[in-house]
Amino acid sequence: MAKQLKYPFLIFIISLAQCQVSNQNVNLCQSNICQNGGTCLVASSVPATATCPKNSIYYMGSCYVFDTTLRNWNDAALYCNNMNSATLPLVESAEDQAFFAGYLQAMIPSNPPADMRPPPDGIWTAVRGVNNVTRASWVYYPGSFLVTDTFWAPQEPNIYVNYNDVCVALQSDSFYREWTTALCTILKYTVCKVAPTQIQAKYVAQCSCPNGYGGQTCETQSTTNQQASTQRTCGSNDFQFSCPNDQTITVDFASFGAQESSMCNQASQSREQTCSNVNSLQTVINACQGLQSCEIRNLTSTFSNTPCPVPQEQYLETRMRCETAQQPSCLSGLIQFDSRCYSMTIETNEKKQRTMEDAQTYCSQSGGSIITSPPDALLQQIVQKVNAETKKTVNFWIGTPNNCQLLMVTGSSTSYSQCPSSPSSTANVICSTVPQSTASVSARPTQSAPVDPVSQTMARREVYTGVQPPSVPDSINKPRYCKKEKKDGITYEQTRACMLHEQPCPDPQNVEGTVTRYCNCQTAKWETPDTTNCTHRWVAEMETAIKDNQPVEDISSTVNRQLKSTIERTLFGGDITGTVRLSNDMLSLARNQFSVLNDRNLRENKARNFTENLGGSGDQLLSPVAATVWDQLSSTIRIQHASKLMSVLEQSVLLLGDYMTDQKLNLQYINWAMEVERSEPEVQTFGAAASPNVQDDMGMMRVMAAAPPAPQPETNTTIMFPSLKLSPTITLPSASLLSSLASPTPVAGGGPSILSSFQDDTPVGMASTPNLNRNPVKLGYYAFAGFGQLLNNNNDHTLINSQVIGASIQNATQSVTLPVDHPVTFTFQHLTTKGVSNPRCVYWDLMESKWSTLGCTLIATSSNSSQCSCTHLTSFAILMDISGQVGRLSGGLASALDVVSTIGCAISIVCLALSVCVFTFFRNLQNVRNSIHRNLCLCLLIAELVFVIGMDRTGNRTGCGVVAILLHYFFLSSFCWMLLEGYQLYMMLIQVFEPNRTRIFLYYLFCYGTPAVVVAISAGIKWEDYGTDSYCWIDTSTPTIWAFVAPIIVIIAANIIFLLIALKVVLSVQSRDRTKWGRIIGWLKGSATLLCLLGITWIFGFLTAVKGGTGTAFAWIFTILNCTQGIFIFVLHVVLNEKVRASIVRWLRTGICCLPETSSAAYNSRSFLSSRQRILNMIKVNGHSYPSTASTDDKEKQLTPITKTTDWLSRLPNQDSVSIPESNFNNLNGTLENSNLNSAEIKEEDEIPELRRRVTVDLNPMIVSNNEIERMSHASSDPRGSQIIEVTAVEKKAPVKRIKFPLGAKQSERGSQHRTKAKVIAPPESPVSESGSKDYRF
């Protein structure tokens, strides 16, 4: 605490005089696992001092922060509201009174400011008054909850004219225990109730045992050789414990707390603590587990955040035992020393080191604590590890905040110094943890975290609805409402939070009653409708038939038929409760009617028909359709009626055995199965008609153990039900043993008697007195699918992870105790293998209506199954703890997905950034299509950055909502640009000429404006759906998700249409311009691939939100695809794009002189000279090189294929004319057609370069004079000295009209306008020969 108490003994006296505190521990378990009268307490896997922030104290699931600034009520409420949505405190129980009495006297300054008149006294609570006609109402804020339990001091509340100005405070005259009224404008101190530190602590169970018992669950009696010890140590003392040589400490129980109004006396009789620290067990385990001796100094300082206000009352109660020492094992990379594992951080950069408070939290997250007083041998290992990392001086925190030191490691030497006074000082940390073992906290049964009872009931509080509204600012108490909603044909009007909405049940002609639905106080969202009062009219009609004593087999048939029809239409909660009630009444009626029948065959037929119909009704109530309606019932009603239904079905099995004439009969349903066997007592063998390991004609699998040759064979029988998925198996003792233990009941009679013979401590042995009764022995088997879920308490972090199986003899409501050496054994198949742990064998206790482990033992277990043995007969199952998200992502899988997401998104972000840079900074790539690429990459880049940085920032509700909105906007914008990818492809195919003005402005307006409108509308209507407690994204359980899904569906559908049109055109047109169509096909492939990637990615993303086992596979697919979007875009549009590659190479060559030419097939042999010739030209002309790549991608450069060199020209024959054969021109014509004037090397249709040289080549032999050749060789030398012939090279401003043909033009139509010779356009200066033909310069 921040300071010592001023009046500890005065508090003690007042406590004795003024109140009686109930001995109810605030940390009691919700499900008791303790045996022999032990008390179950909740313990945390996080050690002490890690739950609350600094300068605060932990109490009942919350942290309380005291502030000395004086404020009026409104300012105090606003101050707390701004502190992570904290609230003012509330006193609603005797435990609260005891806490605040001690806490406030310790915290409120003893010397108030001298200038304050009157001096400040006490703190504000969350309660204030409201004028309500002639009386005052007292309301709790925020939420406007009506206060029902008050704790007024004597003479309170005072009378005021205007109660709107009156608030409730805790003041010193009542020792801060009772309520007093004061004007809200008076200044008082402030205490804020805030949520504890969000450390993923696991809460487990520990047992406080009565005297004489020990073990983790009080399962053993204390003996001297076990060295069992229960020890009490006052908080002002040091704790010590030691074991003999060769033995180590095992901690079974530890709780640091107090008994209010009882000062600690170490020799006094131990009683239950009225308050305790949930971190006690882990703290003591860290200090003592596995050691021969241990010591904890200054207990009050170690457990400084204990909610018990008076240190003089606090004490540590422990129960330890000494066991043979076991060699512990630590994870790889950790230092192992003296039964402890040590992990350490080594950072020389102070910014990466931790403060003392952060270091505590860091160690606590792994269940450990900061090292204290390391011995020399351990220091040597620490020094070695430090020297292996760095040669600099490294500082480590040692001890606790109240007893802190700095360990300095420099080279091979160590030294200690006092901790710096500044709370912002940083150092490295060494964490000490206990090796994992069966005694570790993680191996204990899990429990729900201890919760403030006020918070537990907050969702069901009554809201003030008086005639006059409270005068509270909206910033403190803004009313919230559940929106109008239509569900299952019922319209629920807008309802204020914390209010109950009531509606008549639908279909009033066939259904009677009302349906209610509650608007949750804390979330302002509708809860599940309660249809318990909605019942079809046939239920009442059948109740009347039972009262009229109509034939029970007819009633059961009608119920079965009506129930089936109801499930096919609409089933309500009242139908379930009514049918269970009918089933129980029909069972009693059947006993009465069948017992008076004398005709044996008639009695058997009636009993069989009744049992089949009753079983059919039970099967329908266990169906998946009915399971959703079961969930609408409250937990108490659901468990009560499910337990009754299971009991009725079990009793019906033996009822059939009473009247059957066959020795064996079974009934198989979809959701349950049963078999009943009947045998006469003189028959010593049991089930002899069955063959070993075979399935009989009635569907039962029977495995008979081999019986030795003896007059009375002792054979065990194994039963399973193949008709049920994952059916358990049950192995029973011999028939003769079961017959001797059976306690038969009369065939006729009234209701069953419920006995618990297996609770008798005296087992029935093999030498029991023989049973002389000659009545038939009835043995029933049954297995159920679905009862585990219905009988499970959803609030205790456990689940029934198997089908339910059981057996009974003579009476299903009476259990028979079996000898310890002849138990019944089971093998259960686990329904869920992910996110569960700690299997326990349990049976259903009808008297207590809960699962119990009494008499059952776990034999063996694996991830898929468990084996159990029990010493009694009833219904059994496997109970397991929920250690993760069941059936979804948990543990290592979630961590693996996080790693994959982080690495994949990092690579994707880099690829997207590179793509944006390429499409932005290369001017020759800037066109409409690449603008679409660039913006697509930019939107995905921002979206993935926001995803990585903010997806899990759920601490700040507003910030989380902003992250969700940004993700929604940029992902929608990405898909809009993806739509334009397909649209641009479509426009390229249907337009002959591209319009001169670009539509890029409209593109920007569409892709950035449309998503903004969609997001603005959805966020404005349903802002609360953006961001959840688990992730910063749209709540997938709300209709708002369709604001994202619907546009994506439309965009994907439109793009598919565009791509199909483009594919149809490409496949239907036989174009001579193959290169152009090759370019279109390439773009088509890229667009289709990208569309599939983006579309499939979010399809799997949506499926990931679907609950079930397949969600895991979808999560992996979505994670991988989402993280590789940027990589695919970079590969498709940059790496595999020839034009982009050429631009990048050309850019690189401008800065790197000797960079090799590209080896692309589109350029070699056409655009480059050989390396040898280039070197010769450099020497021959200027002695330096010029770039030889003339690409059509560059609008400023010509494209001149090189066909001749100077060396070739010099070897021509010395004659006046050269005759060129016709074949050469044929080759030349082919060269022209396949020259680099193809579409693949032209960026857009409007990027046609002008003809630099225009020549016409006739297919007749061409005569070229030597003089012209020589003149041409001098005139056409390129800068490197090579002679080139420029054939059909085009120029941007060429005075040539290119002929274009519409899509679908046939080859003949194109060919009719082609000539077998190319047009020759002579340069203006070309002379005309005498024959009328022009001279040509190549």
Curated annotation (Swiss-Prot):
Cytoplasmic face residues: 923-930, 981-999, 1062-1085, 1137-1338
Residues carrying the site annotation Cleavage: L873, T874
Cleaved signal peptide residues: 1-19
Entry keyword set: Cell membrane, Disulfide bond, EGF-like domain, G-protein coupled receptor, Lectin, Membrane, Receptor, Repeat, Signal, Transducer, Transmembrane, Transmembrane helix
Domain C-type lectin: 59-193
Localization in the cell: Cell membrane
GO cellular component, one term: plasma membrane
SMART domains found in the cross-reference section: CLECT, GPS, HormR
Membrane topology according to the record: Multi-pass membrane protein
Tissues where this protein is expressed: Pharyngeal primordium.
Limits of the GAIN-B domain: 728-886
Renumbered residue ranges of the record's region Disordered: 1300-1338
GO biological process: cell surface receptor signaling pathway; self proteolysis
Subunit structure as annotated in this protein's UniProt entry: Heterodimer of 2 chains generated by proteolytic processing; the large extracellular N-terminal fragment and the membrane-bound C-terminal fragment predominantly remain associated and non-covalently linked.
Protein name: Latrophilin-like protein LAT-2
Origin species: Caenorhabditis elegans
Gene name per UniProt: lat-2
